[in-house]
């Protein structure tokens, strides 16, 4: 609402509410609302991830533990095509003996 007042040669215009003023005054509330929504979304995502992690951990703990199958020699990355037995031999002279 605009009111014009004449006082002699000067014209004074009084703007009660302008569109820009409303935007400036409400911009803080808009930013606060956006921040609140983002915080709520992040909180929900964290809660969902925590529940998923707990569910997967209990599922892993309840599974029967089976030993890993041995890697076939053809798929072993350390083999160069030659069939060498992977045996560990130790010489008793190499083993230190503790004396008291």
Curated annotation (Swiss-Prot):
Compositional bias per record (Polar residues), positions renumbered to this chain: 77-87
Keywords carried by this UniProt record: Cell membrane, Glycoprotein, Membrane, Transmembrane, Transmembrane helix
Gene induction: Up-regulated in Schwann cells by EGR2 during nerve development and after nerve injury.
GO MF term (any one): structural constituent of myelin sheath
Post-translational modification: Glycosylated.
Predominant place of localization: membrane
A GO BP entry: positive regulation of myelination
A single Gene Ontology CC term: Schmidt-Lanterman incisure
Tissue-by-tissue expression: Expressed in the peripheral nervous system Schwann cells (at protein level).
Side Cytoplasmic, residues: 50-100
Residue ranges, annotated region (Disordered): 58-100
Residue intervals on the Extracellular side: 1-28
Subcellular location: Cell membrane
Annotated TM spans: 29-49
Superkingdom, natural source: Eukaryota
Membrane topology: Single-pass type I membrane protein
Known function: Plays a role in myelin formation.
Protein name: Noncompact myelin-associated protein
Native organism: Rattus norvegicus (Rat)
GN (gene name): Ncmap
